[in-house]
From Swiss-Prot:
Chain intervals with Basic and acidic residues compositional bias: 1-16
Protein's UniProt name: CCR4-NOT transcription complex subunit 10
Keyword match Protein biosynthesis: no
Swiss-Prot/TrEMBL keywords: Acetylation, Coiled coil, Cytoplasm, Nucleus, RNA-mediated gene silencing, Transcription, Transcription regulation, Translation regulation
Organism of derivation: Mus musculus
Locations listed in the record: Cytoplasm; Nucleus
């Protein structure tokens, strides 16, 4: 891994760092011998030389640091806790904090800071690691070239992990200059001491190999940076360089597959993944990367993009199985429960991708229409990624879908054709028709337990949506960036160490361009606006389901006030506001919202600019990958949406006893759609109007045929006098089903 090798380089450099003008010849000789033994892998001899140095100079903390590093490598890098403890003690001993680094005098402590940054990197504390790395970069001039490169590579890796691709590419340009200048460009006084101990075997060939390896690594980082920026033209150029320098290795093929995925060449992306030779990979114990896990995960992402959701779930489950197998092997090595980071190589601290995979699997299950299974996956993922507002919205959508009882037709974006007759009871004169309830009023879900308990209920959906709103920045015109977001093990960070995930508690770092939403890609300004609109729409729906009409009206009004509102959500906003107003007995205001002219567009409203920039196309969030492929729910056209408005408007007129206006709305809506598309609620509305008009036989015919009858048009003129007047006026049938249409 990128930071694993720098750790080795850092230890090697510090062995020679003790050679200064104030030391004796004996100390120089012991230091050189210790460095040579460390470089050759003879850690026992190295520790013996360091022990002799410690006897001579007991006050030099660098010897203690080198001893800790040598012990760490002697134990195959499995004693991370001990090394971390030693570094913290040394930091307190020199009374130096990163924030206090303000001059070249602190260069002497550079190796201590660097090793701390490497450990923070492996502990997934990326924000803190960047803080240390950037301080080191400020004093990079006096560093010798190899150490300077190690610092730069570590920072590049961290910038890629935290979605700061621009910074990473700038630093890569600096690295290219550094390498092109050769070994004489950055050398300080420390380098001469180190070079004297390396004159063993063919330094020119070794140097050339290191330069080629560094160039290959730079090309791979550039590809990853351009992929994050969705700069496909620049990425295409760098892909050629990667294939020339790295050949058909697994990292290069995974990167090229990611590139083809972003271009929409899904079959080619699958072909490239299948052509990678996973067996040649060194294995997760050496690199910290489970290539098989990444392979299945990437296949799941690609098949989602191809709308093959069940195959995508299959591949994500395979990835989860591989990840669980790897974690089981790693946990078997740990013996001391008090040292949770020890007992396995430090690089394997980044291996576990369970929560990223659960996130992907949950989103995939939600799209395929299995909300309860999706909820189980996402509720586990949210324990780690609790600062992701988009994840809280997805959890709320799981709760809504689970309690809505969405049919297969609704899942496919079609109106349902439910029968209006539930059963027939009695015989002869006592024969009665029992009408099916078309109302989807939510029952009481809280059966004595707290609504905060994570179950797929509407009450818990309300909590999830409140969390999502609170996590959004107050001023979306200038959203605060909290760098530290991390991609999941997806196509974006294929075989590099960017497969690890950032913890959710990250602080504002630099540039107010986005806020993190790990494990998916960060939320930029336009995406934040779209996300807020979706959260408000769901909040209004949930408030209606819970009977909180004032809150529903508040959310609907906020939704309609959003400056960039898609046509589909504007349609829902008017419907939800109207339903809340009707429940509050403000029918006149509701009729204003139900004006069919309010509906001019029902698109999802993702602009072409946004798609080009990829702001809603996280390379690491499979299910969010492309808004234009999102399933369109009913109504799918302006005409269908206006019929829904007219049906609901007719119901509102019925509540004011304006039956002629209601009948007119009903007829107008029925003329705009196919007779088979008329919803059962509209048939019940027509039945109610005929009963109110005294035409019982026609009402029975409608119920029997389950459709509107053309003859209904003439009855407003034929029946002028009331033959049958009920003692109690018939109440209009409520139709909340019209306003429960949801858009993912």
């Amino acid at each position: 891994m990128a930071a694993d090798k720098p750790a080795d380089q850092g230890a090697e450099k510090h062995e020679g760092a003790g050679q200064s003008s104030g030391v004796t010849d004996q100390e120089k000789e012991l230091s050189a011998s210790a460095l040579q033994a460390f470089t050759s892998g003879n850690y026992d001899a190295c520790l013996q030389h360091l022990a002799c140095l410690q006897d001579i100079n007991k006050d030099d903390y660098k010897i203690i640091l080198n001893t800790a590093v040598a012990e760490f490598f002697k134990n195959n890098q499995t004693t991370t806790d001990n090394l971390r403890q030693t570094l913290n003690q040394l930091k307190n001993q020199v009374h130096s904090a990163v924030e206090e680094m303000d001059g070249l005098d602190d260069v002497e402590n550079s190796m201590l800071y660097y090793n701390q940054a490497v450990i923070l990197y492996h502990l997934r504390q990326y924000t803190e690691a960047i803080s240390v790395g950037e301080k080191l970069y400020q004093f990079i001039e006096p560093f010798e070239e190899k150490f300077a490169q190690a610092v730069c590579f570590l920072l590049v890796d961290l910038y890629i992990l935290t979605h700061q691709a621009e910074k990473a590419l700038h630093l890569l340009a600096v690295l290219e200059k550094m390498i092109s200048q050769g070994s004489g460009g950055k050398n300080g006084k420390n380098e001469t001491g180190n070079n004297s101990s390396k004159d063993g075997s063919n330094p020119k060939a070794e140097s050339a190999a290191l330069i080629e390896a560094a160039k290959s690594k730079i090309h791979q980082y550039k590809v990853r940076g351009y992929i994050q920026m969705k700069s496909l033209k620049a990425c295409k150029r760098e892909i050629k360089s990667v294939m020339n320098t790295a050949g058909n290795s697994a990292p290069s093929l995974f990167l090229k597959s990611n590139f083809e995925y972003l271009r929409g060449n899904y079959r080619k992306a699958v072909k490239l993944l299948n052509s990678s030779n996973i067996a040649e990979h060194p294995g997760f114990m050496k690199t910290g990367e489970c290539l098989r896990c990444m392979f299945w995960n990437n296949l799941g992402c690609i098949h989602f993009a191809m709308s093959k959701h069940n195959l995508g779930i299959f591949y994500f489950k395979k990835a989860l199985q591989e990840n669980d197998n790897v974690c089981a092997q790693l946990s078997a090595g740990g013996t001391d429960p008090g040292k949770k980071f020890s007992g396995r190589p430090m690089c394997t601290l980044l291996t576990n991708k369970r929560y990223e995979l659960l996130y992907n699997c949950g989103i995939q299950l939600l799209h395929v229409g299995r909300p309860l299974a999706a909820f189980e996956c996402l509720i586990e993922a949210v324990q780690v990624y609790h600062a992701n507002p988009r994840l809280w919205l997805r959890l709320a959508e799981c709760c809504i879908a689970a309690n809505k009882g969405t049919s297969e037709q609704e899942t496919k974006g079609l109106p349902t054709k439910k029968g209006i007759v539930q059963s027939i009871v009695g015989q002869g004169y006592h024969r009665k028709i029992v009408l099916a309830s078309q109302s989807i009023q939510n029952t009481v879900y809280n059966d004595g337990q707290s609504s905060a308990i994570p179950v797929a209920s509407v009450e818990f959906a309300a909590i999830c949506l409140r969390n999502a709103l609170l996590l959004l920045p107050e001023e979306q015109q200038d959203p605060k960036q909290e760098n530290g977001s991390k991609s999941s093990s997806q196509l974006g960070g294929n075989t590099e160490s960017s497969e690890s995930s950032e913890t959710c508690s990250s602080k504002s770092h630099d540039g107010d361009k986005f806020i993190p939403a790990p494990p998916s890609s960060p939320l930029r300004k336009q995406e934040l606006e779209n996300l807020k609109c979706s959260i408000l729409a769901c909040s209004a729906y949930v408030a209606l389901a819970l009977g909180d009409n004032l809150m529903a009206l508040n959310h609907a009004d906020q939704l309609l006030q959003q400056p960039k509102l898609s046509g589909s959500l504007k349609f829902l906003g008017h419907l939800y506001a109207a339903e809340a107003l009707i429940s509050l007995d403000r029918i006149s205001d509701a009729i204003t919202h139900l004006n069919p002219e309010n509906v001019t567009d029902v698109s999802l409203g993702i602009s072409s600019n946004e798609q080009d920039q990829g702001s809603d196309k996280g390379e690491n969030e499979a299910m969010e990958s492309s808004g234009k492929r999102a399933p369109q729910c009913y109504p799918s056209s302006v005409n269908s949406a206006r019929t829904v408005m007219l049906f609901n408007l007719g119901s509102a007129y019925c509540l004011r006893s304006e039956y002629d206006k209601a009948r007119k709305c009903l007829h107008q809506a029925a003329s705009m759609i196919h007779p088979k598309e008329v919803p059962p609620e509209a048939i019940l509305l027509a039945v109610y109007l005929e009963l109110q008009n005294g035409n019982t036989q026609l009402a029975l015919q409608m119920i029997k045929r389950n459709q509107l009858l053309p003859a209904v048009k003439a009855h407003s003129d034929v029946r002028k006098k009331t033959v049958f007047q009920p003692v109690h006026p018939i109440q209009p049938i409520q139709m909340p089903a019209f306003t429960t249409v949801q858009r993912k």
